Amino acid sequence: MKIGILTFWQTEDNYGQLLQCYATQTYLQSLGHETFLVRTTNGRNYNPSFKEQCIDKVRTAYRLYRYPWYFTKNAIASGLYLLTHGRFRKHNIDLEFEIFRQKNLHCTKVYTLDELRKNPPLADAFVVGSDQIWNTTDGIYYLSWAKDDVKKVAYAASFGSRHSSNDFCQLISPWLKRFDAVSVREESGITLCKDAGRSDAECVVDPTMLLDAQDYRQIASPRILKDKYMFIYFLGTRTMIDWKQIHQFAKQKHLKIVYVASQGQVDKFEHTHASIQEWLSLIDNAEYVMTNSFHGTVFTLLFGKKFLTYPVCGAAAKMNDRITTLLNPLGLGEHIYNGNINMLELPIDYESVHKQMAERSCKGKNFLNKNI
């Protein structure tokens, strides 16, 4: 079967975004399908209601009032980062991600929504997901443009931090009803689908969990550092980080700190700029991992590391749903950071964890096998 995949793909430094796309394509190809990534623009066609716009403005004003120190600190840090790193670093990261795309993904040209409506790529089925594609309200990712006789499947689609509203549900309801099968990444997504009139949505694992550690080791770089180290990976979403505590822990354990930051995370600390292959290797060979990233947590689990996942704060706090959906069923809820860094030392029965992850992965695979 010829399958077109639609998900986010333009990233310059979001490792999880590109790896979930890679995993979806790789798994479907392992079933014998011919797959390709449909590259698209992100034109929006949803206008929030006056009430939603007012609520958004009030939330923004409140955050500025409640956390002025945070916005001031980040503005200063951003300026210092750009002055000291400049475009050279960013260009290098862009180049490495583009090389990964060219080497590992089969891609179409870039389509606009209008072009997709008039002349879509030929396919027997389209699969949308994963990532927060349904947090955008783009008709593109709801396959509003796809013809009726083409199979439409959503795999582990995420609404991100979006809350249900009548306007939003009315918009997406006719689009969701056209899908042959719908699955979401978070339990909260099932509720939102029900509110939009789709009561049969299932919760499945992120596509990165359709592959195992050995699959990723095949594309990962060899070990980069001889010394023992702890790996830190933070995204720019607001997170309460006690850096003094982190450095004290590393000193006590005689560990180096390797710190990769992406998606707008800026601060005064030294960063390591890693390719996707290097990023995988850095997690795989670390003594400990600390992250506020969902995908950072996924790969930490796959590689069997001691870890802490930092919850995000403020308006983005709803994004923690994906972390709890991932960790709580595995009995790893205590590894969500609560101020005690020594929780890094909690023993983890990875034989049991990997068995449970394999069962959840099997459910995701069965969903795809059944509906494609």
For every predicted segment, state its role.
Residues 1-372:
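Active-site anion-handling motifs in enzyme catalytic cores
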